[in-house]
């Protein structure tokens, strides 16, 4: 039975205190979210004003700081470009809060899929282990990773700003090509869906082999052609650590937004979010990490951040 607004409001309040939900509550929440996400598109339309956010990676207290800086949901409309889990200490609470907000305010928050919203990657970079540690079994990991298959791959703000986690694909020239993909599956090792979540812009022209081992690098010529073909003014993406929190590249055809400050609790970077206003005006808000909380007892070393 779907949770009432009152139930959801209670769960959101609990999660905002960094207290995870009961296993059964997570199961019900994921089922509700799945029903909502099934109705969304591979290229999900979004209206302005909206605030665009990059990687969060389980840095729960920095997500709370993001909402403090950018405005609370649902007063501010949000678009998150993936990578909610892994590496940080609070992936469970982070993804639970974002999914609960999606279920409560479905038209006010858009959550896209990142390369870490995958069964395989989360078994290596922390989310699986965190679920085991906090729940004593892998059920919650399974509920969330099953849900991840339904997340939209990209979003389109007012037919002008194209948002996605990673980057472009040599197999995809148009937004209609993306609309035709079957997204409801685990992230493949290769191919167009993989590329959208894994690719990066590069200083060299054309397509290149990605050092990540998945996706491609793409040059300014590729981004310009894609934007021209599809009537776009900008590609907004996440996926790469940038020290100022945002970084323009490729003659302002592409911007990277990264929203995890002091990434992996050691990189020393600022975070940023991108406000897109009523008239499509753009404003970046930068922020530093929230004050450090007492870290949970975890003996695993923080994995390297290059993925």
Curated annotation (Swiss-Prot):
The active site is at 116 (proton donor). CDD domains: MPP_PP2A_PP4_PP6 (cd07415). GO terms for cellular component: cytosol; nucleus. PROSITE patterns: SER_THR_PHOSPHATASE (PS00125). Binds 2 manganese ions per subunit. One of its GO terms (biological process) is mitotic cell cycle. Mn(2+) 1 binds at residues 55, 57, 83. InterPro entries: Calcineurin-like_PHP_ApaH, Metallo-depent_PP-like, PPA2-like, Ser/Thr-sp_prot-phosphatase. It catalyses: O-phospho-L-seryl-[protein] + H2O = L-seryl-[protein] + phosphate; O-phospho-L-threonyl-[protein] + H2O = L-threonyl-[protein] + phosphate. Its main location: cytoplasm. Its cofactor is Mn(2+). Mn(2+) 2 binds at residues 83, 115, 165, 239. The keyword Signal does not apply. One of its GO terms (molecular function) is metal ion binding. Keywords: Cytoplasm, Hydrolase, Manganese, Metal-binding, Protein phosphatase. The keyword Manganese applies. This is Serine/threonine-protein phosphatase PP2A-3 catalytic subunit. It comes from Oryza sativa subsp. japonica (Rice). The lineage of its organism: Eukaryota, Viridiplantae, Streptophyta, Embryophyta, Tracheophyta.
């Amino acid at each position: 039975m779907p949770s009432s607004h009152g139930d959801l409001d209670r769960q959101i309040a609990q999660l905002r205190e960094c207290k995870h939900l009961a296993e059964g509550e997570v199961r019900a929440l994921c089922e509700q979210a799945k029903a909502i996400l099934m109705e969304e598109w591979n290229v999900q339309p979004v209206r302005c004003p909206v605030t665009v956010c990059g990687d969060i990676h389980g840095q729960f207290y920095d997500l709370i700081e993001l909402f403090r800086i950018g405005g609370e949901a649902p007063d501010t409309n949000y678009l998150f470009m993936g990578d909610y889990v892994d590496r940080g200490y609070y992936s469970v609470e982070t993804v639970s809060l974002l999914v609960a907000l999606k279920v409560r305010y479905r038209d006010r928050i858009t959550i896209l899929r990142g390369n870490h919203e995958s069964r395989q990657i989360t078994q290596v970079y922390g989310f699986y282990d965190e679920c085991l540690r906090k729940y004593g079994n892998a059920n919650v990991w399974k509920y969330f990773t099953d849900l991840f298959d339904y997340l939209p791959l990209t979003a389109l703000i007012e037919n002008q700003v194209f948002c996605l986690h990673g980057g472009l694909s040599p197999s995809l020239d148009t937004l209609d090509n993306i609309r035709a993909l079957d997204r409801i599956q685990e992230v493949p090792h290769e191919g167009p869906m993989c590329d959208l979540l894994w690719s990066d812009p590069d200083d060299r022209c054309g397509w290149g082999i990605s050092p990540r081992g998945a996706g491609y690098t793409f040059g300014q010529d590729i981004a310009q052609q894609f934007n021209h073909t599809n009537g776009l003014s900008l590609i907004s993406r996440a996926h790469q650590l940038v020290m100022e929190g945002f970084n323009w590249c490729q003659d302002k055809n592409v911007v990277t937004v990264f929203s995890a400050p002091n990434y992996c609790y050691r990189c020393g970077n600022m975070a940023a979010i991108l406000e897109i206003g009523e008239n499509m005006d753009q404003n970046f808000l930068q922020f530093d990490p929230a004050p450090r909380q007492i870290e949970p007892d975890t003996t695993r070393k923080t994995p390297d951040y290059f993925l």
